[in-house]
Amino acid sequence: MAIDENKQKALAAALGQIEKQFGKGSIMRLGEDRSMDVETISTGSLSLDIALGAGGLPMGRIVEIYGPESSGKTTLTLQVIAAAQREGKTCAFIDAEHALDPIYARKLGVDIDNLLCSQPDTGEQALEICDALARSGAVDVIVVDSVAALTPKAEIEGEIGDSHMGLAARMMSQAMRKLAGNLKQSNTLLIFINQIRMKIGVMFGNPETTTGGNALKFYASVRLDIRRIGAVKEGENVVGSETRVKVVKNKIAAPFKQAEFQILYGEGINFYGELVDLGVKEKLIEKAGAWYSYNGEKIGQGKANATAWLKENPATAKEIEKKVRELLLSNQDSTPDFSVDDNGEGVKETNEDF
């Protein structure tokens, strides 16, 4: 629909005044001088990258990963950091729980010598550090472990047993308003790890909720629910966990998709095992009886041997990964965000701090 000449002149004058006052680029047409594709970082799990619809976690956004204890939350974020570092990106880990194990992080592929780490005393300090790193424009990925450990200063300085209703929720709400714009401007990915709490007196529906109030639920572009659904065994020994991740909220693609993968103790996500499964599913890898073949060449008898072969031949593994991504991501279009709060419940505004 055409705009008449007087309106065009008035609009041009208004845009010129806005840019003069607030700087160039402060207002523009949505499709002007910018890529519509979202830049992403791999999660370290091929099936989860595909479930997210964009090939990974989106840069310049807030992401929340929550689940029960020992479900793989920290492992998943360390895999994201390792993937980002392999691309030459700078990463920071805000260890509010004071529980980061550098030896374990190194086993997962994290370059701990170049990983920025902070163990803040208060929640406010942790969030100010996040904001300072984002505003610097020099940090690409920030992980906060965890929201539940972001204790307000007033609570730390008070007595155990004092009531501090809503303090953490208010602190998170203020931080989200401040951080969202800075993260977008600097194209920094901020990942919050969160814990689960139970609502008291819930008779129907899911009683689970996350800590820190509701602000994070609104501001997060992606919310991932991670659960341990079984054990990985070698004979009688448990060597890992079968893990399921549900994309509860997704603003960059269709939500509610799921991914299942293995987390092996001391190794992290079993990426090459996923590659074998997805390769067979997409008919890139042939399976005849117990034998697996690629391009007519046998790569192993049994999944374990095929996985080991791919690990020893990274060039072939990369080739298969590229083909899988092209097949499974090319037809996924972005859709509006129809996702709601945890497990299908609508979000109710509250000042309660769980």
Swiss-Prot record:
Q: Which domain of life is it from?
A: Bacteria
SUPFAM superfamilies (UniProt xref): P-loop containing nucleoside triphosphate hydrolases (SSF52540), RecA protein, C-terminal domain (SSF54752)
- Record Gene3D superfamilies: P-loop containing nucleotide triphosphate hydrolases (3.40.50.300)
Q: Which GO terms describe its cellular component?
A: cytosol
Region Disordered, annotated ranges: 331-354
Main localization category: cytoplasm
Q: Name one GO biological process term.
A: DNA repair
* Skewed-composition ranges (Basic and acidic residues): 345-354
Keyword flag Cytoplasm: yes
In its UniProt record, a GO molecular function of this protein is: ATP-dependent DNA damage sensor activity
Recorded hits in InterPro entries, A to Z, give: AAA+_ATPase, DNA_recomb/repair_RecA, DNA_recomb/repair_RecA_CS, P-loop_NTPase, RecA-like_C, RecA-like_N, RecA_ATP-bd, RecA_C_sf
| The entry's keywords | ATP-binding, Cytoplasm, DNA damage, DNA recombination, DNA repair, DNA-binding, Nucleotide-binding, SOS response
Spell out the SMART domains in the cross-references: AAA
Q: Which residues bind ATP?
A: 67-74
The places in or outside the cell where this protein is found are: Cytoplasm
- Protein task: Can catalyze the hydrolysis of ATP in the presence of single-stranded DNA, the ATP-dependent uptake of single-stranded DNA by duplex DNA, and the ATP-dependent hybridization of homologous single-stranded DNAs. It interacts with LexA causing its activation and leading to its autocatalytic cleavage.
- Identify its protein family: Belongs to the RecA family.
Q: What is this protein called?
A: Protein RecA
Which organism's genome codes for this protein? Citrobacter koseri (strain ATCC BAA-895 / CDC 4225-83 / SGSC4696)
